[in-house]
């Protein structure tokens, strides 16, 4: 009896509990059902509401992280990273994504994407039940829902936590609205372009190129599964990504997918830039948030110049050459057509812009010195200069210039001296022109680095002791090509022509161009066959700075000016490299490339310039037809001493102190007495006693004491005298 009573009582209790549970559930249904119904109505009512933006607006607002530099023809010649917060490449249309990538994305993220209306209710209910029972925590966000949180910042989780109920609710509403206004393909295309795959790689193009070095259209199944498996957790470990990818792969491909995941994700990503030939111009122009900028460069020419420079520097590596730069400009417009600031051969100097770096000018400034002398009518192309030993007393000591080859050629014409780049005649010309006037002229030509007082440079500026840039030098030579008219060069089409002003006399500029184009005149130093000789008209000058640290070649045709520098950005000297062997071959190659379809014609003589037939005294140079500024042409034969200064003793100078070397027997020591010009007949006297006649250099055995040295002419008149001390 007792057992029956307990059994009956338990059944009664269970029945009552079941009834209560049903009542509670019924109550919950009665309470929740209207709420759910209201919620569903609210969600689908939002379908008529406009989403945060249209597909076209999102695509238009999309910004790549790399800005593009376009050449004059619209070709992308360089891309430059301008956004450091994410790596985004070009927007990829859905049709440009491989089918395997589309399938993998849908399989991993949203297998019923094309059948639901923005919300996968089946997945949502299943995920809710799993989360409530704690069996398997998972999400149920569709591709559409994920996209809404990308498009609307308010729908994203805050501070790394999960979304709140209200935020999730708004996401559901936004997904339905988006699905109602966008096509499925538009949603999927935007999703693939906006999601983050790995680290800073955002969008399918950056992920595909960064991880697999291929365009999205070329992605294969294994690569696609790895990328799709990154979406849920972009920064997950390689092991987690590989495990997730294998879960969606066929059994036979899992090992290869795992190996690929470890190989691909276990190394830093790298995006290869096909367009990377103008880095220095890109850094100049792609500023202030610009995503695109068109410049004056010619892409094909830029590639050729860079390749030529790179090849030349590598060829000279054994002569301690590491770097090179080149600049090409159109004479008439000032458009810069090629700007190669670095040959790219030295990894330690890849970011150095050698075009704007200051280097010693060498002989490249001589044409402007001679132009000023011609302009002032102090000289003509046929004037005779003495190429002989020279010593100049300066406030800082004795200045003794030398020719590059240490050969003295005696009397030479201005044409020969400039074309053959003789140093001592150039210093003599500077003595005629004046250091101050020459420095001021260089400043007028845009040499901003020449900013010190004239006395800072002294006579050495004639031989290029001043620091200049290739940019400044090319524009100065372009001024010669434009008959003396100076204007700024340009890298962008700004719509305005830069104002031109007359800096050089057009008649003198014509004479300089004629001299620099004279193959015969330059043969004295360089020979007839060299890298300065072109099959069309060009005017060109080389330069080499002290200790072979800088190597220049700058010249122009009727259309283009080209400048090349070879050397070391570190300042180390080269070994046995001159302008004719270093920079000139590159210059010649560029000129030939520029004129492969047409020729270059010599400039027409301007008004006020005329030619005349002339001969030289003692036949120091062959007879020729020479050009002159009207009124400066010689009457008949050119005399050797036409432009000589007053005869003088060049060594020792006044009050020179000479010390006898105690280590060397006195009778073996010699002091050279020097005099110029050498063409005169004269007599050496020391302490009023005759010691020699017509010796350009007299070697004297020194004796202690104060001595008076003089030179006298045939009539005994003192031409020059100095007092010096020996101790």
PLM regions and their residue ranges:
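A penicillin-recognizing enzyme superfamily signal
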Residues: 295-318, 327-330, 339-342, 346-360, ...
């Amino acid at each position: 009896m007792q057992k029956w009573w307990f059994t009956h009582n338990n059944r009664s209790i269970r029945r009552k509990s079941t009834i209560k549970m049903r009542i509670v559930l019924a109550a919950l249904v009665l309470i929740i059902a209207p709420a759910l119904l209201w919620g569903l109505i609210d969600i689908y009512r939002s379908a008529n509401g406009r989403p945060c933006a249209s597909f076209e607006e999102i695509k238009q607002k999309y910004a790549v992280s790399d800005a593009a530099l376009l050449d004059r023809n619209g070709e992308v010649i360089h891309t430059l990273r301008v956004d450091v917060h994410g790596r985004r490449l070009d927007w990829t249309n859905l049709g440009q994504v491989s089918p395997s990538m589309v399938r993998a994305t849908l399989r991993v993220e949203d297998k019923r994407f094309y059948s639901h209306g923005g919300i996968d209710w089946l997945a949502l209910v299943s995920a809710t039940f799993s989360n409530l029972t704690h069996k398997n925590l998972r999400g149920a966000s569709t591709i559409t829902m994920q996209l809404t949180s990308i498009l609307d910042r308010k729908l994203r989780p805050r501070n790394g936590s999960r979304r709140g109920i209200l935020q999730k609710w708004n996401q559901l509403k936004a997904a339905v609205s988006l699905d109602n206004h966008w096509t499925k393909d538009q949603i999927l295309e935007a999703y693939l372009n906006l999601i983050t795959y790995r680290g800073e790689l955002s969008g399918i193009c950056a992920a595909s190129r960064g991880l697999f070095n291929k365009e999205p259209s070329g992605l294969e199944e294994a690569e696609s599964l790895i990328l799709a498996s990154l979406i849920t957790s972009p920064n997950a470990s390689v092991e987690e990504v590989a495990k997730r990818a294998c879960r969606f792969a066929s059994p036979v491909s899992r090992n290869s997918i795992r190996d690929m995941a470890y190989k691909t994700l276990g190394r830093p990503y790298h995006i290869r830039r096909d367009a990377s030939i103008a880095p220095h111009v890109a850094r100049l122009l792609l500023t202030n948030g610009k995503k695109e900028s068109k410049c004056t460069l010619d892409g094909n020419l830029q590639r050729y110049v860079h390749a030529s420079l790179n090849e030349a520097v590598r060829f000279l590596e054994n002569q301690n050459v590491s770097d090179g730069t080149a600049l090409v400009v159109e004479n008439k417009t000032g458009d810069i057509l090629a700007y190669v600031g670095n040959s790219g051969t030295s990894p330690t100097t890849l970011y150095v812009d050698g075009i704007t770096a200051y280097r010693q000018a060498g002989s490249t400034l001589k044409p402007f010195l001679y132009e000023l002398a011609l302009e002032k009518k102090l000289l003509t192309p046929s004037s005779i200069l003495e190429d002989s030993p020279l010593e100049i007393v300066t406030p800082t000591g004795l200045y003794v210039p030398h020719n590059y080859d240490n050969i003295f050629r005696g009397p030479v014409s201005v044409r020969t001296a400039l074309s053959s780049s003789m140093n001592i005649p150039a210093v003599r010309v500077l003595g005629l022109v004046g250091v101050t006037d020459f420095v001021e002229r260089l400043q007028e030509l845009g040499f901003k680095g020449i900013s010190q007082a004239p006395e800072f440079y002294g006579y050495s500026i004639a031989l290029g002791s001043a620091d200049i840039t290739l940019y400044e030098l090319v524009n100065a030579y372009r001024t010669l090509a434009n008959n003396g008219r100076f204007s700024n060069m340009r890298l962008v089409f700004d719509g305005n022509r830069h104002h031109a002003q007359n800096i050089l006399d057009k008649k003198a500029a014509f004479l300089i161009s004629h001299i620099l184009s004279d193959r015969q005149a330059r043969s004295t130093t360089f020979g007839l066959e060299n890298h300065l000789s072109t099959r069309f008209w060009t005017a060109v000058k080389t330069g080499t700075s002290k200790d072979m640290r800088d190597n220049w070649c700058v010249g122009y045709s009727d259309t283009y000016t080209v400048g090349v520098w070879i050397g070391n950005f570190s300042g180390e000297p080269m070994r046995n490299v001159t302008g004719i062997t270093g920079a000139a071959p590159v210059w010649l190659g560029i000129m030939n490339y520029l004129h492969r379809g047409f020729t270059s014609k010599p400039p027409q003589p301007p008004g006020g310039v005329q030619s005349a037939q002339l001969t030289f005294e003692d036949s120091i140079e062959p007879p020729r037809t020479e050009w002159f500024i009207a009124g400066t042409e010689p009457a008949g034969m050119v005399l050797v001493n036409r432009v000589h200064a007053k005869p003088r003793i060049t060594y020792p100078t006044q009050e020179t102190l000479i010390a006898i070397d105690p280590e060397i027997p006195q009778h073996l020591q010699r002091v050279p007495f020097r005099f110029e010009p050498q063409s005169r007949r004269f007599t050496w006297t020391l302490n009023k006693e005759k010691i020699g006649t017509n010796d350009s250099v007299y070697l004297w055995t020194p004796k202690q004491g104060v001595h008076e040295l003089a030179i006298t002419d045939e009539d005994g008149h003192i031409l020059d005298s100095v007092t010096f001390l020996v101790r």
